[in-house]
Amino acid sequence: MSRFWSPFVKDLVPYVPGEQPKLARLVKLNTNENPYGPSPKALEAMRGELNDNLRLYPDPNGDRLKQAVAEYYGVTPAQVFVGNGSDEVLAHIFHGLFQHDAPLLFPDISYSFYPVYCGLYGIAFEQVALDEQFQIRIEDYKKPNAGIIFPNPNAPTGCLMPLQVVEQLLQANRDSVVVVDEAYIDFGGETAISLVDRYDNLLVTQTLSKSRSLAGLRVGLAVGHPDLIEALERIKNSFNSYPLDRAAIVGAAVAFEDREYFEDTCRKVIDSREVLVGQLQAKGFEVLPSAANFIFARHPQQDAGELAARLREQGVIVRHFKQPRIAQFLRITIGTPEMNQALLDALS
């Protein structure tokens, strides 16, 4: 702490990102990165941007990427916002859409950046308990609120809310912005983007870090009514008018256009997930139903924190959360078959 810090900074409780170890030979299953590389076509497109044009600023609107997203989802570019990772997109949403008199609502078990954003922007919030199956109860959200946000599939549980239930939540909150954070939707869910033309209060966020293997590039997006998108553009242009560099815009656009590679990669992750679930269950683990590129598991005879530490000693890193309701679970990223086997060998 410095004497130059403002009281505001002193009171901040920052987000703690997943560990990015520098040690070699570690099996890294802790931050939900895709074990397969980006689209070769996307890599080639990005290499093509490494030329003298880097002296020029990139397109502040990211129109090339917006067009690719719009074509992929059957919406218009005016319904698309792009930013420097979905975390930045979410930050603009919190800043621009959730500062009202009533509290923001989100699940008690969800993305741990949500309360951090609330602290940063002075947003009152209420964490609503998930049920015993780690699902949202629609009735719990029928109360005055400044907005609603939740990850679907849930992070860190991986549990999916079916699209018809998402629509029920929208119908129950016509006068509030409902944000569906779909970082993991491509691994087994149905996107709510299909609903944006029917609900002007719906905003869907996604990232290219997971299913499109571009975590190191930092590209995120939001899709919703043009009025909501305009609000995000106003925030963006009051903060950083050039959030995406030239290579990121082109590479992300091509990643959307290369559907064959994307679908093949997702299928490999899903297939590996289902195999690993069965293998862990055979070892006595309880594994929650997952529609993500990770699983959430616990063993009735093993303390999760101790197990994570012992796995690390064997060169395998997984994620352990100390939150009371989930303190006995481990979040395990789906790796390649070889990475998953290393996990099983370490457990043995």
UniProtKB/Swiss-Prot annotation:
Pfam families: Aminotran_1_2. Its EC number is 2.6.1.9. Its cofactor is pyridoxal 5'-phosphate. It is an enzyme of class 2 (transferase). It catalyses: L-histidinol phosphate + 2-oxoglutarate = 3-(imidazol-4-yl)-2-oxopropyl phosphate + L-glutamate. One of its GO terms (biological process) is L-histidine biosynthetic process. GO terms for molecular function: histidinol-phosphate transaminase activity; pyridoxal phosphate binding. The modification N6-(pyridoxal phosphate)lysine is found at residue 210. Keywords: Amino-acid biosynthesis, Aminotransferase, Histidine biosynthesis, Pyridoxal phosphate, Transferase. It comes from the Bacteria. Pathway: Amino-acid biosynthesis; L-histidine biosynthesis; L-histidine from 5-phospho-alpha-D-ribose 1-diphosphate: step 7/9. PROSITE patterns: AA_TRANSFER_CLASS_2. Belongs to the class-II pyridoxal-phosphate-dependent aminotransferase family. Histidinol-phosphate aminotransferase subfamily. Homodimer. This is Histidinol-phosphate aminotransferase.
